[in-house]
Amino acid sequence: MIIVLLPAYNEEASLPVLLPKIHDVLVSHAEGYRIIVCNDGSRDNTAVLLEQYQGTYPLEVIHHSINRGLGESSRDLFERAAAVSNPGDFIIRMDCDDTHEPEFIPSLLARLDEGYDVVVASRFQPGGGQFGVSAYRRFISRSANLFMKVFFPIRGLWEYSCGYRAYRAETIKRAVSFYGNNFIQLKGLGFTCTLEKLVKLNLIDARFSEVPFVLRYDQKRSASKMVSSVTTLGYLVMTLLCYWPFGGWRAVYRGKAPDGDKPPISNDTPRTLIARSAIYVRYLRGSRQHRAFRSGSG
């Protein structure tokens, strides 16, 4: 079974486009599929449309009476997925605004079949990219990913901020069982939960990989929900929570992961963290030079 998780807030324009595309990609899957949507207090016709689509697609809806934010929506979605899935199932989490094309789902699933636990759709892999993203947003995104790579190094990952990912259901079930309600702890700090899931899964020794992905921001059909200042604050708070020597995540969870495995993050030092960022720094410099060339050639 493939379980697709969609956090939705004011997505009346996106749902009629996205749901048929998901269906077209997954309808032929031998084990079937299921979509779980969290309607996070939408003020438009999202709830009405979801009710209508329940007669067309294998769709379950979680309703929030008010807008609680991406953190709480993600928590409810992943806890529900852990409850209804079997260990052999796969979980796909993607955005509901039509910027994440379902056509990449097969490559995500194929990489899971290679033995990985978490596969991230990456703009930074060869063949990946993005359309419709301003130069400012590209700079912010790449800078944020550099920060995350330095302070939260995960083998096999360069793309930390994209929420388009595939998970083994057994990995999510193990994480929810291990962390309880703290699997997604920073629920009120914007998009910080997108990073938190990776960090928490890394602490239980999940295996990570990436596949190329093209972000279609030019197809976005709803207003952006991200508040950069709140998310930046969340990253700083998470850094303290992770590395605080008295009761921080590393101190509390290190060596206590299921099966007795130590998390790979435990062996990193500030020197190795900085060294690992060198490739990404060169990438940022190359991107700036490319933009300067394009500006000069116009």
Regions found by a protein language model. Give the residues of each.
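Acidic helix N-cap motif at the loop->helix transition within catalytic regions
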Residues: 13-16, 42-53
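Acidic donor-diphosphate engagement hotspot in glycosyltransferases and nucleotidyltransferases
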Residues: 18, 46, 74, 103-105, ...
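Acceptor/aglycone-binding surface of glycosyltransferases and processive sugar-polymer synthases
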Residues: 60-83, 90, 100-184, 219-226, ...
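Short, well-formed alpha-helical segments that are part of the catalytic scaffolds
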Residues: 11-26
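Hydrophobic helical membrane-anchoring modules
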Residues: 1, 107, 181-298
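A conserved acidic beta->alpha catalytic loop
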Residues: 39-48, 66, 98
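Short beta-strand/loop segment that forms part of the nucleotide-sugar
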Residues: 6, 31-41, 62-64
